[in-house]
Amino acid sequence: MKFALVLLGFCAFYLVNATGDLETELEASDLQELQEALDLIAETPLESLEAEELEEARKFKFPKINWGKLASKAKDVYKKGQKLAKNKNVKKALKYGKQLAENLAAGEVHEPGTPVGNNKCWAIGTRCTDDCDCCPEHHCHCPAKSWTFGLIPCSCQVTESDKVNKCPPAE
């Protein structure tokens, strides 16, 4: 609202100054009306405008928060999280994620292509096609079926009790 009044006043002031050379062509009454409009804008108290804005701000109310309902939702989410933490598949995914994060952060035990024994092996997390690409103590793990090839590629992983490297030893 203030901005509109200031803009109107500025435009009116510009018109008065721009038409100053043309005073002779304009009638005195038109100039008088324009001058009165400028005076009216100048006399409008900004305090009344601020009071209106303050009144509107007072009328605005923040939504009430039901803290009990919020706490019960938080408790439900916590319980669901604990159930998920007990899930066998989630545990495996968490273990895989932790292993991957550790390998990315700490670096690898074996650099890609480094000979280990008679085999050349690739670092943990490196893409692989079969167990022979990985070190003897690692295996090539494919987390998804072949239709996701490229999206979730196979990679060398630490060998667990249920997974073994099936590549025949190098001669």
From Swiss-Prot:
Region (Linear cationic cytotoxin domain): 59-104
Pro-sequence residue ranges: 19-58
InterPro entries to which the protein is assigned, alphabetical: OXYTX_ICK
Cellular component GO terms, alphabetical: extracellular region
Signal peptide as annotated in the record: 1-18
Keywords: Antibiotic, Antimicrobial, Cytolysis, Disulfide bond, Knottin, Secreted, Signal, Toxin
Major subcellular location class: secreted
GO terms under biological process: defense response to bacterium; killing of cells of another organism
Residue stretches making up the Oxytoxin-type inhibitor cystine knot (ICK) domain: 118-171
Disulfide bonds: C121-C135, C128-C140, C132-C167, C134-C156, C142-C154
Subcellular location: Secreted
GO MF annotation: an example: toxin activity
Reported tissue expression: Expressed by the venom gland.
Family designation: Belongs to the spiderine family. Cationic/spiderine subfamily.
Swiss-Prot/TrEMBL domain comment: The presence of a 'disulfide through disulfide knot' structurally defines this protein as a knottin. The N-terminal part of the mature protein (59-105) probably forms an alpha-helix which acts as a membrane-active peptide. It is necessary and sufficient for the toxin's antimicrobial, insecticidal, cytolytic and cytotoxic activity.
Job description of the protein: Has antimicrobial, insecticidal, cytolytic and cytotoxic activity.
Name of the molecule in the record: Spiderine-2b
